[in-house]
Amino acid sequence: MNYKKYKGYETIVLEDRNWPSRKIEKAPQWCSVDLRDGNQALITPMGLKQKLRFFEYLVKMGFKTIEIGFPAASDTEYEFTRTLIEEGYIPEDVTIQVLTQSRIQIINKTFEALKGTKNAVVHLYNSTSTLQREVVFRNSKEETIELAVFGARAIKELALKNPETNFTFEYSPESFTGTEMDFAAEICNSVIDVWKPTKDKKVIINLPSTVEMATPNTYADQIEYMCRNLKSRENIIVSLHAHNDRGTGVAATELGLMAGADRVEGTLFGNGERTGNADILNLGMNLYTQGINPELDFSDINSMIEIYEESTAMNVHPRHPYAGDLVFTAFSGSHQDAIKKGMARMNKQAQYWEVPYLPLDPKDIGKSYEPIIRINSQSGKGGVSFILEQNYGLYIPKDFQKDAGRVITAYSDKMQTEIGAEEIYEVFLNEYVDIRTPLQLNYHKTQSVDSDWDLVFIEAEIEYNMQKHYVQAEGNGVVSAFCNSLKEIIGMDIDIVDYRGHSMEYGTKAKAISYIELKNETGERFYGAGTSSSVGKSSLRAVVSAINKMILAQQTKDMDTQEEDIA
């Protein structure tokens, strides 16, 4: 790769820059350019019905300025503008914005298209960059300024002839980031001299990174330079229009706001020419997650995705910030464990949202908690236990969680795929709950040996290897007594390490579930669970499940030993 064919971008000489120490404290003025900049970048541009639907959705979100197109560019663009105006699509508090070049026939057609609207921004632009001037237009700086001033005067005169509309004027030095900064300030000030903004009639100076050419801090330097050098700054709305060619359109916009800008033009999901525009969803939610009202409604992200994908035939990437299908998903075991603990803490104290790996509460944008933790071979106990707890009301003891996590991630590895909540639950049931072979409890009865029920006597009928046995024993509680009664039959000592239980929160019939952790003579741990409408029965069934796992493990070892001896 011949990297020497490229040259680095020149840095801006800006002494005592202030933007690095500033922070964004409020939402900017937003302008959606989905229907113009976004639409012109589509393989198949939107038709009239799609545009109308998209416009209505942008209004619903709270946009107060919407760039609807370039009405002089085509009959389709002109018809869309007239339809919005004549059929009453534009609310009283919403301003439509249209684009025009600095040519009199185009400006005249633009004002004709706007006839009858209450509020409109007329957006004038011409290319100012060194490359565009020298290669495309072959204009001098003076000729470039003359073109901008000509358009500014024509727009001002036509606005005076249409007093029924409240016009705002906007000027963009296209390819601003490739323009010499002193010249950018000069041409903008020449336009400002024509329009003569006031406190009540401000002018928008839009500073686009038409092609993103440098790091975001360079754009911020350029914006701060312009804010310092624009005439009548207090009557100017400085606007940003960042593209994403280097992948930093959002960052450049945020730094541009820190540098003094007041307004942002962008699109939903960053749709736009080449690699796209600055993503207003991304920008707005970045504000929201810092405790700042974005002044736009992102509460139903799924509807936004649906409208966007149907209208543009583009897909939202599964990793797209805030919106993608995998944004609120953790496969990693350590991440899952941290999320589980964070969610548990949120249930106890919730003044601020603070959950590891989740900078946003999914419910705030209409997402659910269900897909937060998803299980594959990289997952661990935290993820498995979170899903079983959230979906099925199973509060599994900590050491039991480790064993279940190992079993279920091994299953996922074997299947070579992610597994869902229902499948996780089925694996858990099959592996641990109410296991009845080779040992089965047919019936039992208990009685207290002392008045405090500390010492309990149990009689039971069990079936082991297809044979029935009647057993009895005493123990420190029902579970201990039952384990003591089985020692002679199964030929193993059994130690109870942990026993817990709770009522199940899943299903129409109330049930109890018990969890048992047992230890054999060599110190190996085994886990089982049992369910019943009776707490006592559920605990004994849990013991049977754990013992069956112990027996089956021993049988597997014995078979392995026999095979080694034969070999």
From Swiss-Prot:
Q: Which GO terms describe its biological process?
A: L-leucine biosynthetic process
Please list the residue ranges annotated as the Pyruvate carboxyltransferase domain: 28-302
Which UniProt keywords are present, listed alphabetically?
Amino-acid biosynthesis, Branched-chain amino acid biosynthesis, Cytoplasm, Leucine biosynthesis, Magnesium, Metal-binding, Transferase
* Residue numbers binding Mg(2+): 37, 241, 243, 277
Q: Which major enzyme category is it?
A: transferase
NCBIfam families listed in its UniProt record: leuA_yeast (TIGR00970), PRK03739.1 (NF002991)
This protein is called 2-isopropylmalate synthase
Query: Looking at the record, which segments are called Regulatory domain?
Result: 435-567
Gene Ontology cellular component terms for the protein in this record: cytoplasm
Q: Which domain of life is it from?
A: Bacteria
Pathway assignment reads: Amino-acid biosynthesis; L-leucine biosynthesis; L-leucine from 3-methyl-2-oxobutanoate: step 1/4
Q: Which Pfam families match?
A: HMGL-like (PF00682), IPMS_D2 (PF22615), LeuA_dimer (PF08502)
Signal sequence interval, chain numbering? none
Q: What is the lineage of its organism?
A: Bacteria, Bacillati, Bacillota, Clostridia, Peptostreptococcales
